[in-house]
């Protein structure tokens, strides 16, 4: 079995299990966190959503909102996590079809059946473990998943070719696979929002992008990001989840929490935006 060791434990999150658990509980209880590990359901069924991937001390309280919301719907069999490939390593659209990833909480196994279904539906995706070797955007979701849900599997997908056409093709391939899989799966887009501008600028730019996400308008999201120079590192993964949501009949999106790194660090001159957004029906 291929075992991926943590790349950012001790940097983005604590490397000891007890300290990591305390950090996640800190995130839940934080002033801008959800305050509870389980939130009331919106509608009847959730697909998943958008979740940030910065260091837990910055984005953990916002990330906790999505996981607490999903906990209200019950545990899935599997998470599919689409993240940006920040390093441009490996295939333009990469998947791992087998193996496990290790965190301080233990191993999370890849769902080989679902990974194979996704890969069979999209000829451009490549089974490429190297693409994930340094990438944090997917790794940082796993301790949250392990804290909230026991004995679940996952499928990692990393994307550096973040075009609208690629995003749509990937979203449709995932939707087709989920219809064939016929078990509960949560689909996540791991993304931060605007980068390295003052708090007020980041909030204003993020609001424009979030508005398009809530409208389930993936083309509009790419348009406003381009026209207003909104640096959303996971815009492709977000667009793919929007497309999958529409394909699968999840026509509602709710903003659970929006904040910036300035809200957690107190430093507001150069900030990064974070949002937790839920797709449901």
Curated annotation (Swiss-Prot):
**Domain of life, source organism:** Archaea
Could you identify this protein by its name?
A: MEMO1 family protein Pcal_0028
Q: Which organism is it from?
A: Pyrobaculum calidifontis (strain DSM 21063 / JCM 11548 / VA1)
- Pfam families under this entry? Memo
Region forming the signal peptide: none
Give the organism's phylogenetic lineage: Archaea, Thermoproteota, Thermoprotei, Thermoproteales, Thermoproteaceae
- Give the similarity note: Belongs to the MEMO1 family.
């Amino acid at each position: 079995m291929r075992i991926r060791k943590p790349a950012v434990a001790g940097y983005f999150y604590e490397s000891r299990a007890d300290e990591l658990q305390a950090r996640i509980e800190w995130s839940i209880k934080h002033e801008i966190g959800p305050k509870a590990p389980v939130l009331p359901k919106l509608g009847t069924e959730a697909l998943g959503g958008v979740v940030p991937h910065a260091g837990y001390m910055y984005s953990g309280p916002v990330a906790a909102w999505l996981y607490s919301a999903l906990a209200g719907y019950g545990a899935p069999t599997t998470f599919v996590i689409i993240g940006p490939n920040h390093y441009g390593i490996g295939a333009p659209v990469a998947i791992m079809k087998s193996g496990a990833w290790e965190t301080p909480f233990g191993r999370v196994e890849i769902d080989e059946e679902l990974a194979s279904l996704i890969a069979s539906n999209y000829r451009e995706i490549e089974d490429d473990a190297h693409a994930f070797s340094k990438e944090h955007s997917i790794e940082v979701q796993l301790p949250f998943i392990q804290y909230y849900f026991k004995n679940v599997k996952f499928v990692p997908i990393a994307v550096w070719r973040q075009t609208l056409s690629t995003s749509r093709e990937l979203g449709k391939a995932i939707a087709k696979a989920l219809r064939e899989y016929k078990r509960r799966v949560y689909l996540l887009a791991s993304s931060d929002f605007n980068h390295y501008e003052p708090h007020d600028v980041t909030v204003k730019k993020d609001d424009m992008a979030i508005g398009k996400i809530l409208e389930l308008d993936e083309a509009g999201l790419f348009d406003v990001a381009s026209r207003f120079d909104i640096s959303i590192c996971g815009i492709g993964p977000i667009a793919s989840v929007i497309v999958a949501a529409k394909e699968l009949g999840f026509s509602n999106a709710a903003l659970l929490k929006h904040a910036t790194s300035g809200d957690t660090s107190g430093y507001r001159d150069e900030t990064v935006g974070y949002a937790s957004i839920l797709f449901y029906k």
